[in-house]
Amino acid sequence: MKEIFTFITLFLGVNSFAQISVKTEYISNSKFYDAVSDSNIGDGSAMIYSVGALVPLSMKAPEEDDPYQRPTLWGVGLNGSFVQMYNHHFPVGKELPSQVMNLGVTALHLRPLKERWSMLMALGAGSYTPENRLSSIHIGENVVANGAFVLVWHWRPNIEIGGGVALNNTFGYPMVFPAFYFKYNGAFSDKFTIEVGSIDGLKVALGYNYRENLDFKLIANMGGYSAYLRRNGEKEIFSQQTFVVGLQPEFKIGKHVSIPLTVGGSFIRSGRYRERKLSAMFASEAKNEDGSSRSSQFNPAFYLSAGITIGGN
């Protein structure tokens, strides 16, 4: 599901150029807090490799007098994330996966509606495996069909608000979930920018245009990964949510190449197994004496990433 929303975010701002991105992330070693035992039970680090491509197949340019410059587009998105976790000293029965692979393919269609509205439809499939091997993909076990229908209101040229429905069969049967979208691109003076996005996780960036080919950004990103697997003969989902804050210099080469580098901290990197049931999605892992929930996660750690994006703008 995450992949399809990532493509929606990109597709709403894409033009006639294809876009390809590659990214490598490193999260340093830190202790793992287990919510059930209320203690640290192990430690670990992680490397995350991501690649994505968004290819517009056909495009009708926006009307010249359209203040929101809304094109009509058909496109295809491909996405892959490969997580390698180096876990140590976890007791038997509490081990986390050492690998997670998420792959997705999505067909998308975007078109303007009336004066301030756009419609976006998406249909795709993704695989969520506990191994970084194509042979670990099994239909009926870790392959999920998904789709989305989102209406976007262009409140202002730099503010978009959307809502709709998302569909997937995570639990073995079709389920409909609400989908929300928000995007803001603003600026004050000639040098400072603000970007806020919310559809595949929260993303906030405060930017400063130091030179024509160099931006500095303070970024905060929330994301995550999943693996559908069997433990003790039962279907379960391993999920990992991440929250990263860092300083990101972004180097630009010409109009179509950007190289972002990020240095900062990983403040949330959870790790939890759930039954593959709808009720389990809302169940607390453990609770404190006052009734508040607590979750298993790695302690804060050093974060470093490097990437390159080609095409797009």
Where do the PLM segments sit?
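Short glycine/proline- and aromatic-enriched beta-strand/turn motifs that initiate or cap beta-hairpins
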Residues: 19-90, 195, 199, 309-313
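Repeated loop/turn-to-beta-strand initiation elements of outer-membrane beta-barrel proteins
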Residues: 20, 60-63, 115-119, 157-163, ...
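Membrane-embedded beta-strand positions of outer-membrane beta-barrel proteins
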Residues: 22-24, 74-78, 120-123, 161-163, ...
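Outer-membrane beta-barrel translocator/channel fold
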Residues: 32, 85-87, 198-279, 289-304
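Extracellular loop and loop/strand-boundary signature of outer-membrane beta-barrel proteins
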Residues: 34-41, 89-95, 132-137, 166-168, ...
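Residues that define the transmembrane beta-barrel architecture of outer-membrane proteins
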Residues: 43-49, 97-103, 139-145, 174-178, ...
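Outer-membrane beta-barrel "beta-signal"
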Residues: 51, 55, 179-187, 249, ...
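Transmembrane beta-strand segments that form the barrel wall of outer-membrane beta-barrel proteins
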Residues: 123-129, 158-169, 180-206, 220-222
